[in-house]
Amino acid sequence: DNRLVGSEMCIRDSFMSLGVPIYEGYGMTENSAIATGNTPDKVKLGTVGTPQAGTELKLAEDGEILVRHPGVFKGYYKNEEATKEVIDEDGWLYTGDVGEYDGEFLKIVDRKKDIIITSGGKNVSPSEIENNIKTSPFIKEAIVIGDDRKFLSALIGIEYDIVSNWALRKNIAHTTYRNLSENEEVQNLIWDEIQKANEYTSSLQIRKFRMLTKELDHEDGDLTATQKAKRNVIMEKFSDLIEDMYK
């Protein structure tokens, strides 16, 4: 069996190791589903494939992905202003995603609004770094910081049950998420995991981190309904931790 996926970046190697071929695709509601996709006879790992039949694709100067085809939606209901923000007069849909396109295969870099621009003018995709960090079984959440900063840092949320079991084997006493996160040995463990993730980043790497002292919670407004971290909310809520890294 083959599987076509089109959500957040998936961990392809995990599925492949189970003998399940994964073919990534790309699309959005305004695009009427799929714009690009890999197929069994034409696939390139790390990309979301090639444009579907009848679909035109190009990148704007800032790297934003633009698509045009007969299936692009006509506009938002009774909201002409919002429609003009995403569809130009030539019918190109501005997706809000930044990508890399070689004329054949498309690679998604990040959401345009999430791209970090460091004080040195370097554009950084936080989600790519965050996904590398979260491959660690000990780390549940990673929020990369660095917009208009001299270096990258991260806020880290632990995978409580796994870290707790690790701590028990090390005879590290703890009773709450907070005191487990604040334990020096746990923080050393997490730093080692971040260093492993840094090995996959050729240029900018995480230089400092701070531990979140509570689990992120949808009811507290930290997460979306689909359990994605709300970057701006978290950065505001934990601004003291962030500023401490840049003292």
Identify the function of each model-found stretch.
Residues 1-6, 10-11:
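Single conserved hydrophobic/aromatic residue that forms the stacking wall/gate
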Residues 15, 57, 104, 133, ...:
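Residue-level signal for inorganic ion chemistry
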Residues 27, 41, 70-71, 100-101, ...:
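AMP-binding (ANL) adenylation modules
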Residues 87-103, 119-144:
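Core catalytic subdomain of AMP-forming adenylate-forming
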Residues 141-143, 150, 191-247:
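Conserved C-terminal "lid"/linker of ANL adenylate-forming enzymes
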